[in-house]
Amino acid sequence: MQEQGFILWFTGYSGAGKSTLANAIAPKLRALGKRTEILDGDEVRENLSKGLGFSKEDRDTNIRRIGFVANLLARNGVVAVTAAISPYRQIRDEIRSKSQAPFIEIFVDTPLELAESRDPKGLYKKARAGQIQHFTGVSDPYEPPQKPEITVRTAEEGIDACVTRILAYLRSRGLTG
């Protein structure tokens, strides 16, 4: 019998901690015997969505591509861990509705000021200077999930505590074996 895959969909501002959490939880899932792949928004944009800009239409296309690959992995027994801003609720809900495996939305709820202070690439600074258009939290909106399965607050909890809570949730759903 094939292992059940599922999707962990991390969403939040740039600098919220999505990639950090994805990279922290993936080895824990692998240690539990779960085949696990990370779909990082920056890497997907570079490899599958090259040529797309940051208009709403292009962002929606990028997120749909991530959702398609995540669903493909999950329905083949892989845990797909996604880390992408995915700022628009309607597209996240669309991905959830198309998922053929359990979809766990994880809202990385970080105050914009903190996310901005963590910005190693200087993207917020460039956006505030008008050098980057359509930047979430500056010139474009972020629509928080209305009913995420899990909310983590990286301003209040350490990464290990967040990962522990996520793993506890997955255990409670019978997804970690």
Where are these regions (language model features)?
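Conserved lysine of the Walker
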Residues: 18
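Conserved beta-strand scaffold positions in the cores of enzyme catalytic domains, especially
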Residues: 38, 103-105, 149-151
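Hydrophobic anchor at the beta1->P-loop junction of P-loop NTPases
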Residues: 10
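Conserved substrate/cofactor phosphate-moiety recognition/catalytic segment
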Residues: 23-68
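Small-molecule kinase domains that catalyze NTP-dependent phosphoryl transfer to phosphate-bearing small molecules
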Residues: 109-112, 117-165, 173-177
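The conserved Walker
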Residues: 14
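ATP-dependent NMP and nucleoside kinases share a basic, alpha-helical "lid"
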Residues: 47-53, 70-127, 134
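Phosphate-binding P-loop
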Residues: 1-5
